[in-house]
């Protein structure tokens, strides 16, 4: 299974990547909206872990773009903004799940 982690916080990105690689997943990472957009255009993933707040864009806008491209990746939103409105909006836009930060890596697996 190939997973793309889109997360701007380096320490969290590394923790998630290590945990998933240890479980034998193939993992790629992106730290910005533009880097994520380029990887999504070039490759297919089984799952995308998507942060809402990115330095150069909004994760929900990226989710909308994915759906416009008719990408079929499973999408899990990860966000420090534990807002019910964000959760409902993300799920309504097509995300498969919403994981509020902070979380234990066991919740991710």
Model-derived features: where do they sit?
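N-terminal/domain-start alpha-helical segments
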Residues: 1-109
């Amino acid at each position: 299974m190939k997973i793309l982690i889109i997360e701007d916080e380096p320490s969290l990105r590394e923790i998630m990547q290590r945990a998933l690689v240890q479980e034998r997943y193939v993992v790629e990472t992106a730290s910005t909206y533009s880097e994520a957009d380029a990887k999504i255009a070039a490759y297919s993933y089984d799952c995308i872990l998507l942060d809402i707040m990115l330095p150069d864009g909004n994760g929900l806008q990226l989710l909308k773009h994915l759906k416009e491209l008719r990408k079929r990746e499973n999408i899990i939103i990860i966000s420090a903004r534990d807002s019910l409105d964000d959760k409902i909006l993300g799920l309504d836009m097509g995300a498969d799940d919403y994981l509020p930060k902070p979380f234990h890596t066991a919740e991710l697996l």
